[in-house]
Amino acid sequence: MKKLFYTFMSVIALCEFVPTSAFAQKQYDLETAQPDTTKQNYHLIDGVEISTVRKLVSNNAVSSQLNNKTIERSLGQSLGTMLERVSGVSSIQTGGTVSKPVIHGMYGNRILLVNNGARLTGQQWGADHAPEVDKNSSTKIEVVKGAEAVRYGSDALGGIVVMEQDMLPYNQKHTHGRLLSMYGSNGYRYQFVGHAEGSMPFLPSLAWRIQATYANSGDQRAAHYLLNNTGTREFDFSTALGYQHKNFRAEGYLSRYDLKLGVLYNAQMGDADLLAERIKIGRPVDITPYTRHIDYPFQHIVHTNATLKLYYNTEKYGDFYWLASFQKDDREENRIRRMNLSYIPAVSMHLKTLQNYLRWRKYYGDWQTEVGTQVVNSNHSNQRGTGVVPIIPNHTENQIGAYALQKYQNNRLGAELGVRFDWQDTKAAGYDWTGDYYGGHRTFSNFTYSLGAHYHATDKLTLTTNFGLAWRAPHVFELYSNGNELGTGRFVRGDSTMCSENSYKWVVSTEYRSTVLDARLDAYLQWVKHYIYDRPMKGEYVTVISGTYPLFQYMQTDVFIRGIDFDLRLRPLSAIEYHIVSSMIWANETRTHNYLPYIPSFRINHSLTYTPHLSGKAFAPWIEVKHRFVARQTRFNAASDLIAYAPASYSLFGLEAGTEWRIDTHNTLSLFVSADNIFNKEYKEYTNRARYYAHDLGRDIRLTIGWKF
């Protein structure tokens, strides 16, 4: 009975693996961003370290971590593509330039991005809108696979991507940093990243950090043809300044993300017959020579973030933390327009957001109490004089939330209970293409809770479980949209009568770790009431001045989602490691049992890495061979899709190799070569919204050179 009791408790513990404890257990608080010194330091070439924290305290979140080396080796890739290294994470794409992370089938507004402690409040509601953040400004990225809604509020139904920097280098004598340069063959693109940090010599308790990224790309290629007008220009920078004195710390952070990207010509023009022909052919018909020039149509996004964080530890009465963040997001979309009007943006949207977060936390013995409140105010406006009816109306959103968490932790067992209340007020107003006024005033509110626990059955085996309720109010885009998306080549229509989503998610995880074998199995069940999705309306098209587009209608249904994630590392020899990651997911409407659209199919990634042990420590070379298999998606509703069949299954092979040369104590040079789709396979990914018009990217060889000082 005792053994049965421990087994049962370990299963309950797995619940806690996901949401609320994700960061408390690792001492990975958003205001401190402390580097994890207890992480097992395996040489992981693909960089995925799945909860490698080995502490006496519990690890209460089903999470995976990408370290700084992984981020550096992913130079030239999008955030969504890089996160695909994690089991249970895929991406939904729009061509080769826009990629959004998908966690357990959830994406968009159901995935919360936290950058340097603040919720990223950009315009990510569109399928052709990627997260407006520079991944190179982070040194650690944590993927939490669960409804982490108690601590962070609504919109975290699917999971959270936490992007953090290291602690500012207080009392550091020398200036440290890194320089990285990358060249990629696909698009003949190049990228530079610079980073430096230190503390003031006249005041060591005053620390600083600066970082910048520049990227330039021309037309990208599928396996056998060019994807015209898919070039990009990106320039990002961030800076931080902090002061620390005894138990008090104040830090300011400023960043700017600036991206201009071209949109594939093929999806933008033509009548209904030409549209049907393009979808039938499935690739561009007219292809022009390669160019770096970005022509119409294109998108231009600028996101500015200014954040202030104050932290004070009273020791006796606990610690207090306050965060204030102002974010401004400007998005312009220029299309091919008649009468030489293409220079005027057809879409010019501006979003301003102010968020405040206050938290109190107290440790006493094996217990911890945490109470917090959050206020978010958003104002979205459309630029006048564009000559085009905005796809969404002007709107404001005001959100207020408060939560409480109670945790218990000893050497083997941990448990947690959390509850939260959120209230949201949304006002929208605009005029449609007929000149009629539309919009409205909607109010949403909901309670959220989470109950979880974990249990260290042995020093090598950990069981975790969590059951939680999360919710999300419909976005204004889902309620009132009535226009065509530039990047996806589709016309989207909202439904103003929709109500909020409510989700129940149960996650169970079993993890085993030894010197030879690391294995983890995650299983999850998720019920979502009033699930919102955009359904392709087969045979229905909308014709506007710029062309004819397939109609996608937002609607609601109750769904049941379940799946399994598997991650295994085998080290038969000290210099050899085999790594395999696989995921399966099923998603159905509960009433009709129809499959949901755009759910990732079964996939498996595996790699073999060789790291020779050289006598000297100056060089650290390694080489890796990798393979990805993605099955044909058979679990989709062919009757409602634009195409009655899903793309064929495909296999992609790759190769990575590199070395580091430690010149002295402070200087290290690195060289990294990566080849993706090395055999130049022509394929289409089911979750790519541009698959109706073009294939995915062909072979890409990247060379990265770095210097740390």
What are these regions (language model features)?
Residues 244-258, 290-450, 454-456, 461, ...:
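Face-selective signature of the C-terminal outer-membrane beta-barrel domain
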Residues 162, 199-296:
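Periplasmic-side early beta-strands and strand-to-turn transitions of outer-membrane beta-barrels
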Residues 119-146, 170:
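Short acidic/polar hinge/loop motifs at secondary-structure boundaries
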Residues 160, 165-200, 212, 227:
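Short strand-turn segments of transmembrane beta-barrel domains in outer membranes
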Residues 471-472, 527-529, 534, 629-636, ...:
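C-terminal beta-signal and adjacent terminal beta-strands/loops
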Residues 344-359, 401, 493-499, 505, ...:
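Outer membrane beta-barrel strand-and-loop segments of large Gram-negative receptors
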Residues 26-72, 80:
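Short, acidic, small-residue-rich periplasmic hinge/interaction motif at the N-terminus
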Residues 524-527, 545-634:
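Gram-negative outer-membrane beta-barrel transporters
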